[in-house]
Structures are given as C-alpha cells and as structure tokens.
C-alpha cells in the first residue's frame, strides 16, 4: 500500500497539464482541445496550474513571432530546444502525421503557428469533404507541406497514393 503520489484532484490535474505540454511540445494557457479529458478543469483552475508550474520551474514561457499569447514548454525539454536551435547540420525530413497525433491536438495552435488548417474528415459525409476520407498532414522540416490520402494494400504490400495536395509548391525539390 504505497501512498498516492498525487494527494488531491488539483495535483492530479496539474500533473496531467504538464504531461500534455510535454506530449504536444508547446501549448498556450487558453481553452484548447489539448485539455480534453482533464475532467472538470475550468479556466481559472488551468490558469492557476500554469502559474504554479511556472513558479516551480517545471515549464518555461516563450514568445513566438506573430502570436500574441505566450506559449509554454516543459523545462526538462529546454536542452532539446537549444540543440535544435544550434544545429547547423539540420536536414529536414518528411513525416506523415496521424490525424490523432498529439502534435495536432490543438488545431487552433497549429493554424496560429503554421497557417495550416486541418480537419479529420473521416466522419464527414463524402459530398461535404474538402479533401478525403483519411487524409494525413505532411510535415516537411518545420512546415506543413501538404496532405496525402494513401491506402496500404495489404495483399501486395503497396502504399497507394490516392491523392496529394501541396500547401506550397516552393517546398518541393525534385532531383
């Protein structure tokens, strides 16, 4: 019978907020889908949690050009941020992000940071879809390069690209 490391509901919510900030990487202290399922957490409580996490040195604030609200990241991730900012040998890579990837939890933040609007259209009736049934955002380096609709054909082990939509053709390099 070990004691509960989180003595009350507030401590539990605080722990979950810190975990969410770590999962997404960068969040703001405002209403967000990133806070879903942190039961009964009201705005005033969230604001208090952020104040405490800041005063305890568990999160750090950062200002991003073009965004009025401060954003926050975990203090334990600061060395990683410094490494990324100092990396002169950076080579961008391409990632297809799953619709429920934690990076995409706050769609409004993604729009503010990247100018990229994403909606998972799996439950949208076909005639109302803008893109497709199961479209994945394409992250290339530090930008959203587009969207891809692909299907894995299990029998042939082939990835069939049904459609691709580019956000900015200047990102495309053909060798």
Placement of each model-derived feature along the sequence:
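Long, charged, low-complexity, helical-prone intrinsically disordered regions
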Residues: 1-171, 175
């Amino acid at each position: 019978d070990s004691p509960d490391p989180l003595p009350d509901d507030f401590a539990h919510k605080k722990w979950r907020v810190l975990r969410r900030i770590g999962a997404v990487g960068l969040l703001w202290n405002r209403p967000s889908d990133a806070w879903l399922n942190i039961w009964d957490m009201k705005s005033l409580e969230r604001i208090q949690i952020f104040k405490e996490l800041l005063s305890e040195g568990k999160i750090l604030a950062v200002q991003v050009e073009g965004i009025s609200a401060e954003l926050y990241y975990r203090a334990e991730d600061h060395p990683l941020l410094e490494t990324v900012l100092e990396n002169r040998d950076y080579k961008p890579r391409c990632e297809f992000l799953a619709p429920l990837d934690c990076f995409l939890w706050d769609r409004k933040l993604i729009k503010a940071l990247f100018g990229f609007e994403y909606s998972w259209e799996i439950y949208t009736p076909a005639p109302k879809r803008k893109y497709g049934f199961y479209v994945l955002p394409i992250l290339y380096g530090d930008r959203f390069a587009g969207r891809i609709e692909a299907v894995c054909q299990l029998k042939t082990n082939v990835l069939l690209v049904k459609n691709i939509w580019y956000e900015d053709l200047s990102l495309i390099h053909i060798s």
